Regions:
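Surface-exposed repetitive/solenoidal architectures
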Residues: 1-433
Length: 433
């Protein structure tokens, strides 16, 4: 742990295969120098111990990087971090040849973090095009996962685009994010920025699927974060068809889910456009904090669970499209005697918690319709299968439909709300706030 290694010049790794350090407890100082011409699907440090530090290292854009498919936690610099990773930057593009064969948490810099990751950045694009996942998969532009009450990620920055094309219906959960894949209970993601576009295309999804600027799932604090990238999920078999079935889906500028239990997150801002396009809702889990509603789309947070928001703002345009809500495979709430709602809002889609001093200035554009029927052919008796909507300028609706749990104070909306819908059979709600 007393070892100090300092890089004194850029390192050309042409034709060199590096062997990862299994466990490192000393200090590795990149000293602002670069690794160049590194071709790798492996890490530098498999595990960084609590006394370990890796800092001030650059992965040059000349490197050729690809994520592996057989590791649970992976980053090109550190796989598992229990120490401190700071000042590390990646400029190389990353390809994903195949989705993982084990449930994974991947980031360009660090895979799993239980301590501190700070002042790190990714400038490279991350790209996947291929078959459906066989295991749950979670990707972050910088870090894969933050877990534990002592875990902190701060001043992280992503400018690279994350682009995923899944050729089929995703039957395993998959999460695509600009900065961080997953934030565990009581961890912290602070003062971090995404400027890259996150674009996901699939034929649909029968398990959780998220596209987010900062993080998919947050069980801890997310404060002072900013998204300027455009975030999109297209559930369709071909461009523009909007024919895919979806369930348990989150699309948002900051996070798909925030559940910092009983506490408040502050000052998160989205300026990117948010786009969701699909055919119909094919179902949802009847219980569970993330899965109450089939679809949640919002500028800042999609679903908020027992957590307050303060000073959160959206200026991006929100576009929510479903054009086949009466599909024969769509969700029928009568079958399980439990309602589902498609939710969309300028700041939050479905909330449980106090909203204070939040602001939306972006337009919210909704298309929620059946396929145009043939002349003389009536729509089904249960138009939309009972799947309704809740759309709003600040919040789509209260997660638990209880105003005393989710008051809204000092919030303003100046964005226009545009709704085109022919859903008739269920309780549909829309409002300026």
């Amino acid at each position: 742990e007393d070892e100090i290694a300092t890089v004194i010049k850029d390192i050309d790794l042409t034709g060199v295969t590096l062997t990862p350090a299994d466990s490192y407890a000393g200090t590795f100082n990149g000293n602002g120098h670069s690794l160049k011409n590194w071709t790798s699907d492996n890490t530098l440090f498999t595990t960084l111990a609590a006394t370990g530090t890796v800092k001030d290292l650059i992965i040059d854009k000349s490197c050729t990087l690809s994520f592996p498919s057989d590791k649970q936690y992976f980053g090109f610099v550190v796989g598992n971090n229990a120490g401190t990773v700071s000042g590390v930057e990646n400029y190389a593009d990353v390809t994903i040849p195949a989705l993982p064969t084990v449930a994974n948490y991947y980031g360009t810099i660090c895979g799993n973090n239980t301590a501190t990751v700070a002042d790190c950045a990714n400038y490279g694009d991350i790209t996947y095009s291929g078959s459906v996942p066989t295991q749950n998969a979670c990707y972050g532009g910088v870090v894969g996962q933050i877990t534990g009450a002592a875990a902190v990620a701060k001043n992280l920055f992503n400018i690279g685009d994350v682009t995923a094309t899944i050729n089929g219906v995703a039957a395993k959960s998959v999460y695509w994010n600009g900065v961080l894949g997953w934030l565990g209970s009581n961890g912290k993601l602070l003062d971090s920025v995404n400027q890259g576009n996150v674009t996901v295309t699939a034929h649909g999804n029968s398990q959780m699927l998220t596209a987010c600027g900062l993080v998919s799932y947050a069980g801890g604090e997310v404060s002072g974060c900013y998204n300027g990238g455009n975030i999109s999920y297209y559930a369709e078999s071909a461009e523009g068809l909007a024919d895919g079935g979806v369930q348990r889906t989150g699309v948002a500028g900051i996070a798909a889910y925030i559940g910092w239990s009983g506490k408040e997150v502050q000052n998160n801002i989205n300026d990117g456009n948010i786009t969701f396009r699909a055919g119909y809702s094919s179902g949802y889990a009847a219980s569970g904090s993330f899965t109450k509603y089939a679809v949640n789309v919002a500028g800042v947070f999609a679903a908020v669970y027992n957590c307050g928001l303060n000073g959160c703002k959206n200026s991006g345009e929100i576009n929510f499209t479903m054009t086949d809500i009466d599909n024969a495979s769509s969700y029928d709430y009568k079958a399980v005697n439990n309602p589902a709602r498609q939710s969309c809002g300028g700041v939050v889609a479905s909330s449980w918690g106090k909203l204070t001093d939040c602001e939306n200035t972006g337009d919210v554009n909704i298309i929620f319709t059946t396929v145009k029927p043939q002349e003389g052919v009536a729509l089904s008796a249960w138009n939309g299968k009972g799947v309704g909507y809740q759309f709003g300028g600040i919040s789509g609706g209260d997660y638990h439909s209880s105003q005393d749990k989710s008051p809204i104070e000092g919030c303003t909306n100046s964005g226009d709300i545009h709704i085109i819908s022919n859903a008739t059979a269920y309780n549909n709600n829309a409002g300026g706030i």
